[in-house]
Amino acid sequence: MVDILVLQRVFNRKIPFLKFFLKKELIYVPILGLAWWALDFPFMRRYSKSFLAKHPHLKGKDMETTRKACEKFRSKPVSIMNFVEGTRFTQSKHDRQASPFAHLLKPKAGGIAFVLSAMGEQLHKLIDVTIDYPGGVPTFWDFVSGRVRDIRVNISVMPIQEIMDSGIFQDTYFDDPQVRVRFQAWLNERWQAKDNLLEELNATQKPL
């Protein structure tokens, strides 16, 4: 939650309003579902492998439905936020994963691949953000009550077209195992660079 607030603060008035994909079922959550809908958050529908095994005629329909839902953004600026680890870092999660990274969980490629598949033609830049909390990861109340004295944010930018042209990502991601392996390897390399940066910051407390 604090990461979201930090990102909104850092990018306020610098990039289009940050949004993130939500499962279609969440539109029915009381109050929040209506708020997300009013704010034009994109809702996605994903079919599981077991569901598609029973209903093979629906293969690809989830992506088609999501692309149609995102058509409104062709004429409206948008930024899509994706937390690639998929969950908050805790030492117990890190240990269970046997993560090869000292400060991070393993990155999951599926979420960002879904965004690129659904909206790749509408997005221009990939903004890679690394957030470091020197005093330890704060709670929501720590942040809003002003008890967080120091936050370090590192930002790097890559053109989406560069990712596409280099073959790092292809639209066949969900059907081609080789594409998935190549994209995951690229993501792992970026995660290693993040981990090295966090290690350096922890060792030197050097401001970004």
Task: Label each PLM-derived region with a short phrase.
Residues 1-56:
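Catalytic core of membrane glycerolipid acyltransferases/transacylases, capturing the structured
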Residues 6, 65, 111-114:
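Well-ordered alpha-helical segments embedded in enzymatic catalytic cores
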Residues 57-61, 100-103:
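Alpha-helix N-cap and loop-to-helix initiation/capping positions
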Residues 58-71:
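A Trp-anchored, charged/polar loop motif used as the substrate-binding/catalytic surface
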Residues 167-208:
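Accessory terminal regions of nucleic-acid processing enzymes
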